Every structure is written in C-alpha cells, then in structure tokens.
C-alpha cells in the first residue's frame, strides 16, 4: 500500500466543489445537519462530488490539532494535588480522556493521563512545563502521542 502524501493548499486555490465539501462536512460534524443529503443540499453540492472529495479534503486545524497524548506524572501524595494538576489541564482547554492513578506508596503516586489536545490553547510542551512547575509534581513524561 502506498503512503498518501498531503499538501497544504490555501483555501482560495481549492475548487468550488472542494470548498463546498468542507462546508458540508462541517455541517455534519457540528450536528447542524444529520444527513449527507441535507448538508450537500444546503451548500449547493451534488452528492457525487461530496463522495468524491470527502475523504481527501480536511481543514488544516484537523490535520495539525487532532492529537491524543499520554502523560505519565509522578505526584506527591498531598491533599488537592491531583485536583490542582487537573485544573491546570482544564485551564489549557485540553480534554482528559482517561485518567489512571496508582495507590500512593512512600508518599508518591503515578498518574497516567490521556488527553485530547484538539481544542487546547497551549502547545504540548507548554502544558508539560506548566504541570512540571507545580509544587507537588516531581516528574512529567510524554509517553505517547498520536491522532
């Protein structure tokens, strides 16, 4: 199987059908339209053109921002430390998908967080730095990332 190549193309360089496909996909993803027929009708696109382009055109933010990262965090066992760390993640507008905490041993617990960074207001390294700078945090490692 050959690897697909991706190109960054300015919006005004796209064909009208490609632009309308992106509009129709946005209507479907937002829930404003539930059926493909409704979405293509609203934007003035044929269904055949939609199906031709739907798997080939994506908004730039989708290609760059839809990432899930996994962080491993060593945290001191203090009242409110986990809550404060999660508040830092929330302030960055990241979405916690999973959280796993070991039982604190010798005053330390390991937290594993899976985070969706698609809507995050910070870069990943900035979030890691913010978490690392917290008083109760001993260590933060990015152990996985992908889309």
Swiss-Prot record:
Segments traversing the membrane: none
Domain ACT: 70-145
InterPro entries: ACT-like_dom_sf, ACT_dom, UPF0735_ACT_dom-cont
SUPFAM superfamilies in UniProt: ACT-like
Superkingdom of this protein's organism: Bacteria
Coiled-coil boundaries: none
Family statement drawn from the similarity comment of this UniProt entry: Belongs to the UPF0735 family.
Protein name: UPF0735 ACT domain-containing protein BH1214
